[in-house]
Amino acid sequence: MRIAVIGAGKWGSALHLALKENHNCFISSLHQRDLEDFVSIKEALECEYLVFALSSQGMRAWLKENFINKGQKILIASKGIEDQSCQFLDEIFLDFVPKENFCVLSGPSFAAEVMQKLPTALMISGINQELCKKFASFFPDFIKTYIDNDVRGAEICGAYKNVLAIASGISDGLKLGNNARAALISRGLIEMHRFGKFFGAKEETFLGLSGAGDLFLTATSVLSRNYRVGLKLAQNQKLDSILVELNEVAEGVKTAYAIEKLAKMKGIYTPIVNEVVAIFKGKSVQEATQSLLKQND
């Protein structure tokens, strides 16, 4: 049995380190990297189990260009919604593999702490519960895994919390205090729940690892790149320059645009996301904050 992680960024590298503890695990990306266990894309696709840790915005293009379905079992470890199509990642993968052959990984997990082998808990979601159990068995003892079948809930929580982390970073960057941040996060959880319920996500997902757990982590720590984007926006830095300086993918940026478009199409009330997008488009953080404070629900 062989496992390959597709994507050699921080999260992909952390997953590779964890999975190789007890299994024959490789890592691959489009560009040659000087990494232990690195293999070509062609070699990686020969593995029976694939873990995808690519940018959500580049996932479809990568699959179109490189993927050959050989019955591989897939774990989607990326978090985001494709901006151009407003599709969730599981919808994108359905164009390439049957739904019985993939699961979604979610939960509160900073790559840096996984690399340090610090205790972590993750959720694996899929309609094929036996496959979920199989992927769960691959992880080492310092990672506790749970399984469920709420793929859509896991996808939405994993994507939405990144946008809320940007908003939380803005709040902290403006030095609005712990009370304000707590209010923002709790209202954000309600907003995420409202959005997710429209698409069929399950109630319990929002209060579990995929929802509240990942949101609380991502929205309160400078280890979160999305939170750091918010901090810099609060300093009146331009988004483009922030992303260049970051030199990493902040999934919450493109996902915010996708959620805003979906919410408008479906008539879902998403005030926090709307204000984050307005800030991206030039609205002052102070004005956006005042707009949120005036919201009644």
Curated annotation (Swiss-Prot):
Give the UniProt keywords, A-Z: Cytoplasm, Lipid biosynthesis, Lipid metabolism, NAD, NADP, Nucleotide-binding, Oxidoreductase, Phospholipid biosynthesis, Phospholipid metabolism
* GO terms of biological process kind: carbohydrate metabolic process; glycerol-3-phosphate biosynthetic process; glycerol-3-phosphate catabolic process; glycerophospholipid metabolic process; phospholipid biosynthetic process
Any Pfam family the entry gives: NAD_Gly3P_dh_N
Gene3D superfamilies the record matches: N-(1-d-carboxylethyl)-l-norvaline Dehydrogenase, domain 2, NAD(P)-binding Rossmann-like Domain
Q: Tell me, what is one Gene Ontology molecular-function annotation carried by this entry?
A: NAD binding
Q: Which domain of life is it from?
A: Bacteria
Q: What GO CC annotations are associated with the protein?
A: cytosol
Job of this protein: Catalyzes the reduction of the glycolytic intermediate dihydroxyacetone phosphate (DHAP) to sn-glycerol 3-phosphate (G3P), the key precursor for phospholipid synthesis.
UniProt xrefs under HAMAP family: NAD_Glyc3P_dehydrog (MF_00394)
What protein is this chain from? Glycerol-3-phosphate dehydrogenase [NAD(P)+]
Q: Which organism is it from?
A: Campylobacter jejuni subsp. jejuni serotype O:6 (strain 81116 / NCTC 11828)
